Amino acid sequence: MATKLILTDIDGTILPYGKKTVTSRCVDAFHAAMDAGILVGPASGRFYPWIPEFFGGDASCCATAIATNGSQVYLEGKKALQKEVDSACVRRAMEVLSNVASTGLLLFEGETPYLVQGTRDDLLVCFPRYGETCVERDDVPSAGITKANVFIRGDLERTREIVALLNREVDGLDFDVPQAQFSNVMPAGWNKGAALAWLLEQLGIGRDEAVVFGDAGNDLEMFSTVEHSVAVAGALPEARDAARWHIGAVEDDAVPAAIEALAAGDWPFAR
């Protein structure tokens, strides 16, 4: 089957941690895929309006996109689907976190991150950009929450422990582990994989005609949705084990190299 859709996680997959933009080779690879008639774009926990800057402002690279961990889907640069996080469920999560030291919760209305629980000092350690730009507030809006995140100061093991606690104690929401100290908050049962399945159906693309790349726990459902899942070197163990195919590291532009090959009609993966 010819490849018709390519989706890739951003952080740790095409964007090394600490970098602000992907490489020019990555942008060029996306355009090569588009020129070959392949839909290509990111599948990220990031809020959609922030994504173009990772591609140097080239919005065509995210005209097809899964954003906010599946809560937003874009086609031809237009929002095709949006899910919201339930406010009552968020309050329950805050109740659970109130008994856990060095944790907190962020909500997003539009592009603004609001710190509704926890301290800015802890957030600065866990996710410096949000710590620098967030606005502190006491209330939880009754509707319109497009994105929420939990931050957990500590190592990956502690992050997994607190995320497991939240998944046990909070109905109506799911929590994942994309990296140490941070978790995406999603409507129960909805994630990158659910969004990808919806997208495939809308486009009439088979699960054997899509290739997805990732490195973390929030990519697992996406990996299980299609036949061709690819983990980069250095992926979290759960992502590495779930992927069908394995390639080199983000620092070596392994994903752009694979996209270049797919755009040329080659198959770059081997066991």
Model-assigned labels for residue ranges:
Residues C62-T68, Q82-K83, F127-P128, S229-A233, ...:
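Short hydrophobic/aromatic-enriched beta-strand-loop microsegments
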Residues V100-G104, F108-T225:
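Conserved acidic, metal-coordinating active-site core of Asp-based
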Residues K4-K19:
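Asp-based phosphoryl-transfer active-site loop
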Residues A2-L5, T23, V185-R271:
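Mg2+-dependent phosphoryl-transfer enzymes with acidic/Ser/Thr/Gly-rich catalytic loops
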Residues S60-C61, N69, E169-D171, T225-V226, ...:
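Short, structured coil segments at secondary-structure junctions
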